[in-house]
């Protein structure tokens, strides 16, 4: 139980850290992104970059949670659901600032991407075991 809680909390922290680092990269590397961020007036390319950022953060969170939880395959799913519950209110607040497809892509892929990150780690671990 303690290991599952640690795995879930760490997965959530990893999501925030990865997203923050990648967002910093977007600010530094994508022309106009830093200026567009305060008003959320992103171009299509910027919106796609933000969705990709979220996907990488979700994959990392799932892999981290799975690595720590090991024998509890439900933990990454719990992490994904917690993230979804945390993000829905924020997306409702900014609903008018983004097209519907943006919100739907982010919210509907959040839980599956966390689970997929966990599955990728499990698959990699299974193939790395000596025969």
Label every model-predicted segment.
Residues 1-131:
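Juxtamembrane/disordered regions of integral membrane proteins
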């Amino acid at each position: 139980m303690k290991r599952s809680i640690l795995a879930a909390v760490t997965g959530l922290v990893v999501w925030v850290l990865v997203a923050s680092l990648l967002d910093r990269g977007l600010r530094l590397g994508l022309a106009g992104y830093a200026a567009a961020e305060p008003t959320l007036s992103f171009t299509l390319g910027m919106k796609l970059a933000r969705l990709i950022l979220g996907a990488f953060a979700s994959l990392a969170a799932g892999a981290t949670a799975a690595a720590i939880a090991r024998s509890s395959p439900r933990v990454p799913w719990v992490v994904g659901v917690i993230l979804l519950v945390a993000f829905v209110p924020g997306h409702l607040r900014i609903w008018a600032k983004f097209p519907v497809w943006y919100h739907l892509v982010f919210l509907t892929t959040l839980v599956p991407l966390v689970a997929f990150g966990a599955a990728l780690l499990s698959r990699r671990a299974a193939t790395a075991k000596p025969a």
